[in-house]
Amino acid sequence: MNSPDNKKPILVLKDISLSFKGVKAITDISFNVYEGEICSVIGPNGAGKSSMLNVINGVYIPQEGTITFDGKEFTKMKPHSAAVMGIGRTFQNIALFAGMSVLDNIMSGRNLMMKANFWEHALNIGRAEKEELEHRQAVEEIIEFLGLQSIRKTPVASLAYGLQKRVELGRALAAKPKMLLLDEPMAGMTMEEKLDMSCFIQEINRNYGTTIVLIEHDMGVVMDISDHVVVLDYGKKIGDAAPDEVMNNQDVIDAYLGVSH
C-alpha cells in the first residue's frame, strides 16, 4: 500500500454540496486522494457515497464546490470529458453489452483512444488496421491479466455475475485511466470472488500505477487493501484518515461500524 508522503493529490474535492429538489445528498465534502493510493469510501446506505462518485466523473453537477483532477480545476464536466481526462468508472449495476463477447466488451473501452475515422475503420485501411492491432494487443493483455482467456469469445450475458464484474473492470482498465472509481465492485460476490477481485484491484494499483477510489461495505477488504479511508454519513464527512485511525474513530463507530467491529 502507498503513503501520501511526498505524493501529490491527484484528486481534490473542496466544499462539495449536492442536492435534489432541496434535499441534500452531499454537504460540504472536502478531501484529497493521493496519486497511487487506494482510497476506500465507506458509510451506511444512503450516506451519499455513489452520489459523490457521480459528482467526480460528471454524472451529477454539484451546486457548490470545486473539483481538481490531475491539476485541472472544474465545477462541472460531462462523463465523456472525465473519461478523456483519465477518470475510469464501474457501477453498482453492471452496464455491459450483453450480446457482445468478453473481448468486444473490453475492446469498447479503447474507443476514446482510437484516432482513425469512421471510413478508415469501416474499410480497415490506412492507420485503422495498425490501430486495431495495437488496441487488440492491449486488450488481450488485460484479458490474460484478469484470467478471462478461456471465455474471451463468450457473450457476457451467459457469464456468472462475478465474471461479468471482472469484464466490467477490464473494460474500465482498457481506457488506461489515471484513476478508477469502483462503485461496490465486490457486492453480491462469494468470498472466493471477493478475494480474486481484491487481488486484481491491488495489482492494478501496483502494476499499472492506477489510483483507486472504491466504495465497499466489507470492512475486512477495506482494512486489507486501503491506504486511506473516507467515511460519509447523511451526506457529511465524519472520517478521513488511515484505516486504523478510522476504525478507532468514535463518530465512525457510532454511525457505521458498531461496537462489535
Q: How would you describe each model-predicted region?
A:
Residues N2-H261:
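Glycine-rich phosphate-binding loops of nucleotide-dependent enzymes
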